[in-house]
Amino acid sequence: MLQTRRRMLSFALVVGGLWALPSAQAAGVSAKQAAQIQAVVQAQLKAFAADDAVRAFSFATPRIRKAFGNADTFLAMVRASYPMVYRPSSVSFFKPEKVDGAWLQQAQMSDEQGVLWQVTYVLELQRDGAWRINGCEVVASEGRVA
C-alpha cells in the first residue's frame, strides 16, 4: 500500500495537477461541459485500449506532454504504473465538478483482478476550447467486483 501511495504521489508531483482540496467549494458544471469532459477521458481510455500512444498523449495538457517528452514514454509509464487506467475492466463516471477552480472528473474503475479504484482526473480548458487532462489520482477502494 505504501508503494502504491508513493507512486500516486510521484505521478501527481510529476504532472503538477493535483493538490489537497479539504475545504473546497464545488461549482456547477453544465451538461455540455460534463459531456465534453467525459468524452476526453473516454477517448483517452479508448486510445489506451488500442495501444495508440500518440492519440492517448494528445489528450494530455501541454504541461504533461512536456514532462513526459513523447507519447511512447507516456504510454509506458501508464502501462507499468497504472494498469487499472491502462486496461480497466469497467468504468463508471460520476458527474464532473469544478472545485476551487479545478475541473475534476471522478470515476470508479475495476482492474482485471476485480479490485475497485477511485480515479480523479484533473482537466483544463485550453485556449482553443479543447479539454485536456492535466493529471490523474488513483486510490484503491474498499470493494471488489464479484
Regions of interest found by a model, annotated:
Residues 2, 21-50:
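Short, low-complexity N-terminal intrinsically disordered segments enriched in polar/charged residues
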Residues 35-39, 43, 53-102:
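Short solvent-exposed beta->alpha transition segments
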Residues 95-146:
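Exposed beta-sheet edge and beta->alpha loop/turn motif
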